[in-house]
Structures are given as C-alpha cells and as structure tokens.
Curated annotation (Swiss-Prot):
Substrates-to-products reaction catalysed: pseudouridine(1915) in 23S rRNA + S-adenosyl-L-methionine = N(3)-methylpseudouridine(1915) in 23S rRNA + S-adenosyl-L-homocysteine + H(+)
The protein's name in its UniProt record: Ribosomal RNA large subunit methyltransferase H
Catalytic activity, EC: 2.1.1.177
SUPFAM superfamilies: alpha/beta knot
NCBIfam families in UniProt: PRK00103.2-3
Keyword S-adenosyl-L-methionine (UniProt): yes
HAMAP family, per the entry: 23SrRNA_methyltr_H (MF_00658)
Biological source species: Methylocella silvestris (strain DSM 15510 / CIP 108128 / LMG 27833 / NCIMB 13906 / BL2)
Keywords per UniProt: Cytoplasm, Methyltransferase, rRNA processing, S-adenosyl-L-methionine, Transferase
GO MF annotation terms: rRNA (pseudouridine-N3-)-methyltransferase activity
Summary of subunit composition and partner proteins: Homodimer.
Length: 160
C-alpha cells in the first residue's frame, strides 16, 4: 500500500525539511518488507485567495483531485481523535490488509483543512489540542509513519 503525505505549503530547505526527509527515508527502508513500498511526499502551494474560507476551499479541490482511486484519506487536524502510536500502527496495518491501494495523510496550510476534507476523511487524527505549524506537523507525521513501521516489524524503536 502506498503511503502519501500530502502537504499544503512547501517547506524551504533547512532543518525541518531535512528531519522530515530523514524520517521518510527510515519509513521507506522499514516499510518495504511490510507491504509499504514507499512514503511519497507531495507538496503544493497554499492558495492566494484573500479570504480563509476561499483559501481552504481551493486547497480542498487540490487535495481531492490528487487522491488516487480507492485511496483512503486521513486528515490531520486538531479537532480529530487522539490516538496512540500503537493504535495508528494498527490502523495502517489493517488498512493495508483490507487491500487499500493507498493511504493519504493530509496536512492543511496556515488556515487548516476545509470542512469538505474533514467530511471526506476517515479518520481525522489529532496530534493534540494545541495548534502546530504545518512544517512541524509534517515532521511529526513522518516520524509517526516510521514509528508505525517499527511497531509492525517488532523493532524496539517504540517503547511503551
């Protein structure tokens, strides 16, 4: 099953990009033997619309247009469910075992994700009730994908 990290906004070269890329590379190495051939990072520019609602609507169109047929959509949003790393890992394994061709994790831009995306997503996952910059959420998502691979593989990286 392909894993796609879909990000509104582009990260400039720097430590944030390097760290997220490092976790993606680790997830790729750990995931191949588990039926996750690679984590693909897709970025697109934030909308330039003046109103937040218009920006979110334009970004939602781009997100929905980029989904592969049959792909499962997970929205990362502060309103979502709080899940443990083990629960997230189990969800990835179950989704793979059900035969989904791809799983897309969507990270919104500065305004967050539109209601349309939140309605289309199942599940909506939160990294906490605080608001984080999308560059940091990208790192956190990449790390959680790597952590999920290690949990599925029985690797000691994750400790309860």
């Amino acid at each position: 099953m392909r894993l796609i990290l879909l990000c509104v906004g582009r990260c400039k070269a720097g430590p944030e990009t390097e760290l997220s890329q490092r976790y993606i590379e680790r997830a790729n190495a750990a995931g191949r033997a588990l039926g996750f051939p690679r984590v693909e990072l897709r970025e697109f520019d934030e909308s330039r619309a003046r109103e937040p609602a218009l920006r979110k609507a334009a970004e939602a169109k781009t997100i929905l247009a980029s989904l592969s047929p049959g792909a499962r959509l997970v929205a990362l949003d502060e309103s979502g469910a709080l899940v443990s790393s083990r629960e997230f890992s189990a969800f990835l394994g179950k989704t793979r075992d059900e035969g989904a061709p791809a799983l897309t994790l969507a990270i919104g831009g500065a305004d967050g994700l539109s209601g349309e995306i939140l309605e289309a997503a199942s599940p909506i996952v939160s990294f906490g009730r605080m608001t984080f910059p999308h560059q940091l959420v990208r790192i956190m998502a990449a790390e959680q994908l790597y952590r999920a691979m290690t949990i599925l593989a029985g690797h000691p990286y994750h400790r309860d």
